[in-house]
Amino acid sequence: MILAIQLFYFGVSDPWLDFVVPSIQFSMELCSEAPHYDNDWPSDITVWVNGLEIGTWTSPGDFGGRRGKLNPAWWPDLSTQFGSLKTWRVDETRSTLDDVEVSTTTLQQLSLLSNSFIGMRIGVKENARFKGGLNLFGKRFGDHEQDMVMRIYYML
């Protein structure tokens, strides 16, 4: 069961809350980066969490040719317009990209509960096959009305 707690209060007899984290997820709209735009401009975009690689997506291009649904009027037509909405997820057994396994990195390996922060990095590796850069869209650009989102799923 996944709970979205809006308010939780503690009394003297129960001064803490125990929870289990079964997965963590990162969702974002992104694409390659080329001069102006180029729909055929692949880029190997990798995500790391706490220094561990969780998976790479090969973006097929830097998308243009039509306006992004959310782009402001002042944004030039010949620039990057939109991306693809991608979701990386790490659970107790594997890492996935859009529900397809991309690595064997697990939640336990990320040491989420023993660190004072969660470090997330997105980029293109120096030794990537396709080094086409990247565009990362917020909720007012592209086609998907969302900023980059990190979700930590938990169970009580």
Where are these predicted regions, by residue range?
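Extended, solvent-exposed segments with strong compositional bias
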Residues: 1, 60-113, 129-132
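Short beta-strands within extracellular/lumenal beta-sheet-rich domains
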Residues: 2-20, 100-106
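A short beta-strand element within beta-rich, extracytoplasmic domains
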Residues: 20-39
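Short, well-structured beta-strand segments within conserved domains
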Residues: 24-26, 107-109, 114-127
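Beta-strand elements of well-folded, non-transmembrane domains
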Residues: 30-34, 51, 124-128
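Short coil-to-beta strand junction motifs in C2/discoidin
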Residues: 37-49
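Surface-exposed loop/edge segments in extracytoplasmic proteins
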Residues: 51-57
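Proprotein-processing/basic-patch segments
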Residues: 123-156
